[in-house]
Amino acid sequence: MKSDNQPASGALLASEKTASLGSVRRRSFLTTLGLGSAALAVTPTARSQDKVIQGFERAPTAPDASRGWKPVSDRKIRVGLVGYGVCQFGAAFSFQDHPNVEVVAVSDLIPDRCGALAKAARCDKTYPSLEELVKDDRIEAVFVATDAPSHPRHCLEVLKHGKHVASAVPAVFGSLEDAHRLFEAVKASGLKYMMFETSYFHEDLYGMRQVYNAGGLGKLLYAEGEYFHYMPTPIDSFKGWRIGLPPQWYPTHSNAYYVGVTGGSFTEVSCMAAPSRLDHLQPANNRYRNPFGTEIALFRTSEEGMARMGVSWDSPGYGGEMGRIRGQKGSYYGKYEGSEGNLPDIKRPPLPPGVEAGGHGGSHGYLMNEFVTAILQDRKPLVDIAQALNMTVAGIVAHESAMKGGERLKIPQLKMW
C-alpha cells in the first residue's frame, strides 16, 4: 500500500493516533476500531527499524539523470506538505530538493511525526492539521499524503482555499459520489490537480506511452496490469483502513497500464474474485464486509479493446506493479515489438539537479517534477483529475461486480471536455 496514514481530522484525541495491527482477528479488530488505549502511534523511530515496505525501495538515480534538464522558470513555488505516517510519504517525492520549490510549511496531526516531516523537508513552519495549513496565504500548492479515506475531503479543502493540489493514490476511496464531487470541484476551480500514480513513470509504462502516442501500437486490443502485494498482516494504518481493504478499491497501480498509456478509460467491467483464507479478509473482520483478497477485472476499454487488471493481497510470491499491452501495430512487454521502425526516444525525461528518482520503480522524482512543471507552465498535469478518476472509479465498480458474482456493470465516464 502506498498512501500514507495521517489521521483525517484535526479534532482527534492523542490516544486515537494510529491503529495497532499486530493481530487482526475479530477481537483485535474491534479493539482497534474502539480506539482508546489500544490505539498506538507508530513513531518514526519504530518505523525505521522495520523492513522496507514493498515499492519503497529507492531506485538508484542514474549519474546522468539531470543531463539535458533546463529550467522552465526561475520562480519558486511555495508548497505545503501534509502527512508523514508509516510510509513517510510527505517527504518521499523530493519537493524539498526541487530548485523551483520552497517548502514553506508541513503538517501531521501527531507532533512527533510533524517534527520529523519538518526535518526531512528542511522546513521550520509546522501546522497541527491540514485545515490550519491551508489557511496560510503564502502556500500555492499542497501535497496531500494523508490516509486514503480522507484524500477527497482533504483535496476539496485545499481547492476551497485556492491552492493547487497533488494527492497520493487513490483519488477517492470507494465512493462514486466523492468522485463526482471532486471532479466538479477541480473543473470549477481552474486549479491544477494531479494524482501521484507511480506506474506512470515506471520505465516500461513511460516507454509504452511514448510509443503509443507516436502511433507505434495503433489501437490497443488488449492490456494487462497487475499489482500484487502479499499482506498476511496489513500495513499499519489510521483506524485500520487497510484491514480487509477491497483490492479493486486500490486499483490505480494496475489500471495505469491502460489509462496511463492511452489516456483512455474503461467503459464496463466483469470482475471475478475468490474468498480469501486470511483473517483480515473475512467479512466479519473488516469494516467493508469484504471477503476477497484477489480481484481480477476484465474491462472493456474506450477503444473497444479489452483489459485484464488484477490486484492481490493474499497470494505469496513475486510482487510489484507490472503490465503488458498488445495493439494493432505492435506490442510492448519490456520492449517494443512491432511493425513501426521510426519510434521516439523512450528514455524518461531528465530530473532537476538534486532530485532523486526515488521509490516505486524510480518514479517519485518524476511525478513531483511533472506537477511542479505543470504549475510553472500553466498546463494540465499528466495525471489530471479525469485520468485519476477513470482509474479509481473503474476499480470501485469492479469491486461491486465481484460482490455480485462477476455481473457486468457500466462504468461512469469522466472527461474534461
Please state what every model-predicted region is.
Residues 141, 147-148, 152-200, 215:
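Beta-strand-loop-alpha-helix segment that lines the small-molecule cofactor/substrate pocket
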Residues 1-24, 50-51:
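N-terminal secretory signal peptides
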Residues 45, 49-51, 191, 218-222, ...:
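C-terminal capping/lid region of NAD(P)-dependent oxidoreductase domains
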